[in-house]
Regions:
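Trihelical helix-turn-helix/Myb-like DNA-binding core that engages the DNA major groove
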Residues: 166
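Short loop/turn elements at secondary-structure junctions
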Residues: 191, 207-274
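Soluble non-cytosolic domains of exported or imported proteins
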Residues: 23, 27-31, 85, 220, ...
Length: 274
């Protein structure tokens, strides 16, 4: 799982310092990131849809068909004038990332290229329909996107999850949906030019990882600012997981809400209007 990418760490630590902590071993960083996510998940899992929030962020690949709300970042090696690039290649120039619409070599020009965005810019896939909401009233024929599928409402309902087999009379079976491979992130009809992760959570996960990295190097001499950042992260996780007012984390909540409704029979009452 890669919930973080290198740019997240560079907000808080220089690359040279990060390499000192990891010994330039990215496997250590990946392992401790999993540990940090597991720790955060233990606080949040009862209240938030952590399975969704902690999905990967990966470098965009034209060969991959991405599902709704999946996130990617732009990355490519710098263009080298002595190389010959095939059509469909991705290159970087002056911190911009380009998609080549024809083969290219020689001095850099923007001819036969499509600008995708800035190096490391994050995008997420737009869903084909609105995301299902437990508090919305749906009528016959309404379509929603939920957990990588498109569902059609068969009977008026509210609060009935489309992917719950008990609700088969209210929703169709659902059709898997994903974006056509090769759809460029610059296509604003298909992609959002935005990072849909909780930025607070990203910061706190980074703080937890840096704490574990420092502990690995010198367990008896962890910098006080690293300890404080770790403690702040844990305190925030505890507050976000609690029911007390004060912190509303920007993380998708579990739907339907626990205790959202109590059934006194096997079939919920319809919401009828006349």
């Amino acid at each position: 799982m890669a919930y973080l990418y290198i740019r997240d760490y560079l907000r808080q630590i220089q690359s040279s310092q990060l390499n000192q902590l990891t010994g330039s071993d990215n496997a250590i960083l990946s392992t401790l990131e999993l540990t940090a996510i597991e720790e955060a998940n233990s606080y949040l899992v009862q209240k938030y849809d952590t399975a969704y929030e902690f999905t990967d962020i990966t470098a965009w690949d034209a060969a991959v068909s991405y599902q709704g709300q999946r996130r990617v970042y732009l990355y490519a090696a710098d263009y080298v004038s002595t190389n010959t690039y095939a059509s469909g290649s991705i290159v970087a120039n002056n911190n911009k990332v380009y998609y080549l619409t024809a083969s290219k070599t020689g001095a850099w020009t923007t001819a036969n290229t499509t600008l995708l965005g800035d190096l490391y810019q994050v995008f997420n896939v737009k869903t084909p329909y609105m995301v299902w909401d437990a508090e919305e009233l749906y009528g016959i024929g309404n379509q929603v996107w939920w957990h990588d599928k498109v569902y059609t409402c068969l009977n008026q309902n509210t609060g009935l999850a489309p992917d719950d087999s008990d609700n088969a009379q209210y929703w169709g079976l659902g059709t898997s949906w994903s974006l056509t491979a090769g759809t460029l992130p610059s296509d604003s009809t298909k992609w959002n030019a935005a990072d849909n992760r909780s930025q607070q959570l990203v910061t706190y996960i980074v703080n937890i990882v840096l704490y574990y990295l420092s502990k690995r190097i010198a367990p008896q001499n962890i910098p006080i600012n690293v300890i404080t950042a770790y403690e702040n992260a844990i305190n925030w996780l505890m507050a976000a997981a609690g029911d007390k007012a004060g912190i509303t984390a920007n993380i998708p909540r579990i739907q339907p809400k626990k205790g959202y409704r109590t059934r006194m029979s096997s079939i919920p009452r319809n919401n009828n209007t006349y």
